[in-house]
């Protein structure tokens, strides 16, 4: 894509998209509420262990946004060394991550996230989750899910993982 500069005789420099990848992994922990993709999942088993609500979808999306913009990672911005973020909702972290990325001179094109695990069952609430995530980011967020066919920690039901990509454009 080439953007035109109004009144200029030649096209402006091409707008180069920047892509980032993010991951997040949490173990299940009895006694915690299960938050995933910005939603509370009643009846889907125990929640996830973590400094915040351990929402692997929101956290992976944050990491992908920071990666695309070259602005560090989730731990740098919201890690255990930052007590003000203890217990924070993943959707709050995602909203703040999007703000940080935009303040860094970038616009967000989109984010895609995949949950790896046998629960929660994403399909039944996919549209609701995508709406909540997209509102937090201020750009389209798509959500998919996969299992690991009984292999590894997700297959054994010990936890879940989130994998994300984000596309951003420099605006400044």
UniProtKB/Swiss-Prot annotation:
Names of required cofactors: a divalent metal cation
Binding site for a divalent metal cation: 24, 26, 59
Molecular function as annotated in GO: 2-C-methyl-D-erythritol 2,4-cyclodiphosphate synthase activity; metal ion binding
Residues noted as binding 4-CDP-2-C-methyl-D-erythritol 2-phosphate in the record, renumbered to the chain: 24-26, 51-52, 73-75, 153, 156
Keywords: Isoprene biosynthesis, Lyase, Metal-binding
Top-level lineage group: Bacteria
Broad class of enzyme this protein falls into: lyase
Annotated catalysed reactions: 4-CDP-2-C-methyl-D-erythritol 2-phosphate = 2-C-methyl-D-erythritol 2,4-cyclic diphosphate + CMP
Functional description taken from the UniProt entry: Involved in the biosynthesis of isopentenyl diphosphate (IPP) and dimethylallyl diphosphate (DMAPP), two major building blocks of isoprenoid compounds. Catalyzes the conversion of 4-diphosphocytidyl-2-C-methyl-D-erythritol 2-phosphate (CDP-ME2P) to 2-C-methyl-D-erythritol 2,4-cyclodiphosphate (ME-CPP) with a corresponding release of cytidine 5-monophosphate (CMP).
Family: Belongs to the IspF family.
Subunit composition and interactions: Homotrimer.
Matches recorded under PANTHER family: 2-C-METHYL-D-ERYTHRITOL 2,4-CYCLODIPHOSPHATE SYNTHASE, CHLOROPLASTIC (PTHR43181:SF1)
Protein name in UniProt: 2-C-methyl-D-erythritol 2,4-cyclodiphosphate synthase
